[in-house]
Swiss-Prot record:
GO terms for biological process, alphabetical: L-methionine salvage from methylthioadenosine; L-methionine salvage from S-adenosylmethionine
Provenance organism: Sorangium cellulosum (strain So ce56) (Polyangium cellulosum (strain So ce56))
UniProt gene name: mtnD
Cofactor(s) needed: Fe(2+); Ni(2+)
Annotated Gene3D superfamilies: Jelly Rolls
SUPFAM superfamilies the record matches: RmlC-like cupins
Nuclease listed as a keyword: no
Pathway given in the UniProt record: Amino-acid biosynthesis; L-methionine biosynthesis via salvage pathway; L-methionine from S-methyl-5-thio-alpha-D-ribose 1-phosphate: step 5/6
Keywords: Amino-acid biosynthesis, Dioxygenase, Iron, Metal-binding, Methionine biosynthesis, Nickel, Oxidoreductase
Family from the record: Belongs to the acireductone dioxygenase (ARD) family.
Site residues (Important to generate the dianion), renumbered to this chain: 104
Record-marked site positions (May play a role in metal incorporation in vivo): 95
Complexes and interactors: Monomer.
Record-given protein name: Acireductone dioxygenase
Length: 180
């Protein structure tokens, strides 16, 4: 079940928690974050290739691309069998920004998408069917957990795809992580 925990930047031990789609979307919107629940029921073979995932979700990919001006989409899929998953986890765990909007739709699995907004940290447990989109310049990080298992579609305005600018902050290390 999707969940949002909102922490004060200065206190990673206490949070307000939201579990309904309506509450999560409302609190997210207050921080200029888009959170929606989409259908993720298209059949995919185990270990589906990027082309298979994008083809299965061609309609939603095209619709969001046209609505938001995205020019490319890719698929990231990580499992415990992915040889470099510890390095991938570390790569996404540091707080960073993008110079473009970022959107992710979880086709399978789950992850912890954290937004550093003002003096708060919004920690979204995103799961199959969740779409989260953040505007350019939003400080954030993503935790796939020690035993990752997810597939998500990512949209970009820049044809180069995922390009992060790390902030140098250690804030992500002070907040709860996604555990197995």
């Amino acid at each position: 079940m999707s969940r949002l925990r909102v922490y004060r930047e200065s206190d990673p031990t206490r949070a307000d928690e939201y579990t309904t789609l309506e509450d999560i979307a409302r609190v997210a919107a207050e921080a200029q974050i888009r959170f929606e629940r989409w259908s993720a029921e298209r059949p995919l073979p185990p270990g589906a290739a990027q082309e298979q995932v994008l083809e299965a979700y061609a309609g939603p990919v095209k619709q969001l691309s046209e609505a938001c001006g995205f020019v490319t989409a890719d698929v990231v899929s990580v499992s415990p069998g992915t040889p470099n998953h510890p390095e991938l986890r570390r790569k996404f765990l540091d707080e960073h920004i993008h110079t473009e909007d970022e959107a992710r739709f979880f086709v399978e699995g789950r992850g912890l998408f954290c937004i550093h907004h003002g003096e708060r940290v919004l920690s979204f447990l995103v799961e199959k069917g969740d779409l989260i989109s953040v505007p350019a310049g939003t400080r954030h990080w993503f935790d796939m957990g020690p035993e990752p298992s997810f597939t998500c579609i990512r949209w970009f305005s820049d044809p180069k795809g995922w390009v992060a600018e790390h902030t140098g902050s250690d804030i992500a290390s002070r907040f709860p992580r996604l555990e197995a």
